[in-house]
Amino acid sequence: MVQLKQAVRNLSVDSHLSSSEIFNRVIKEVQEFLFRQGGFSAANWGDVLIDCINIWVTEHPNLFKLYHFLNHILILLQTKRKDELSSTEALAYVRDYIEFWEPVANKVTNNFIDAVDLNDASVLLHGDNVLIHQLFKKLADYGVKPNIYQTVTRPTMEGKNQAKILAGLGFDVSYIEDVTVGKFVSLIDVFISGADGIRKNHFINKAGTLMISLACERFKKPHYVLCDSRNIMNEAESSPELIRKLTAEPPKNADAMWAFPPNGVVPISYYYDTTPSNIIDKFVLEFGVFDPEQIEELDVSYPVSSLLDISY
């Protein structure tokens, strides 16, 4: 129990993780926690896991895929009596969830490759996204070597990790400051980003995505958004209170901007921003390539657990 609570605290203070890293860390911590329970029933560990899940949902808004996973764990805890649900059964449920969703990344990247020819292209990337890693791994395997411009992706600087990964795959990567995109946008053929959360008319992603997307619109450069259906907000089943909780972002610690500002100066930092869907070109998901206006037609509904704390 203590180890899981410590893992929650560690994740709270590790502010430079990408969305993919946060998602993978949470899944790992849940699996290890359930394994440590040694087959005992949820009567012994269920309340602790519920509390930690609600902390994760609160501390990591805008990550709709993470919420999708955590909500499914709560649904399991909600639908079975605690004295009838063993940690072994819950762990098997988590492994089944991982196995079910594992092929999705392959489908998304294949759909992009079928839709967009990157031979001799120049590509702009922002953030650090596992789908982007897998896409470029396939391109390397196929001998397709586009020229890459990778942003630093402030304030978390997570673009550095993606630049290292892509360079390790054999690509030439120009590592550029976010604010200098205007100098490079005329040189690119396509901007590729992920999306942490998609709603009917807009999507949430790393801060800077809106600025870059507006530049691409102005210079008539296509913007493709790679994600899977878990990133789409379950609008039909979610209360207004839950939607507000999942889309609210309080200002982050801004010490990296200015540790000791003078009186009258207030550094403000956010990790995410919101981009109108009508300024991008396509969403690429596991079941196809979609125009922005088609997103609200997709059925991504699933039950919402009553164990979720919707206060914020």
Model-inferred region functions:
Residues 1-93:
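Long amphipathic alpha-helical segments
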Residues 129-141, 213:
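Histidine-anchored nucleotide/phosphate-binding helix
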Residues 54-85, 93-105, 110-113, 126, ...:
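Non-catalytic, soluble scaffold/interaction modules
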Residues 151-312:
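Conserved phosphate- and dinucleotide-binding cores of soluble alpha/beta proteins
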Residues 123-133, 155-156:
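Gly/Ser/Thr-rich loops at beta-strand to alpha-helix junctions
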Residues 74-119, 144, 148-191:
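Ligand-binding beta-strand-loop-alpha-helix segment within the catalytic cores
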Residues 13-16, 122-124, 128, 199-204:
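Short, glycine-rich nucleotide/cofactor-binding loops
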